[in-house]
Amino acid sequence: ILPVDQGFEHGPARSFAKNEDGYDPHYHFKLAINAGLSAFAAPLGMLEAGADTFAGQIPLIMKVNSSNSLSREKYSPSQAITGSVSEAIRLGCSAIGFTIYPGSDAALDMISDIQDMALEAKSAGLAVVVWSYPRGGDISKEGETAIDIVAYAAHMAALVGAHIIKVKPPTSHIELEEAKKVYIDENILIDTLSNRIKH
């Protein structure tokens, strides 16, 4: 899946200035198609710019929530709803995509939002993709990719009904003291990336 929501998240210059073709939404459609990828995920406006032109050439995933780097959300990172199931259907999308931030003070609201949208999407025959990226609250920077935290984030995404889940590759760091004892006592293998992914 080629996800292109960087312009929303980080602004156009930081996202596309090194490759000016990236300013053109059609460039990203073509990149995903020519690379033989499984799908192209983007926010509403980018999909609207090319959905008709590239109809039927690659499955589309509408990213229905987004954040931006202008807001101050160190402890309570969140995302705004920026798309809808009806807009995804109108553009011929195969799925909706949603980001949650487990650990954020806003996480419970985000989980409620995706659960409601997932029900609507599934009722319309669309798949649900969840990007589950722990951050905020009491999670340290190292903890954002800790095995126990990433596993928890993936589990939460599965429990809200995601068909496809994206997490960052976990490190062998264990963030929570309560979890450390379980990993040791149960001899959970986390020595290699392969074992951590399997977990």
Model region roles, listed by residue range:
Residues 5-199:
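Alpha/beta enzyme core
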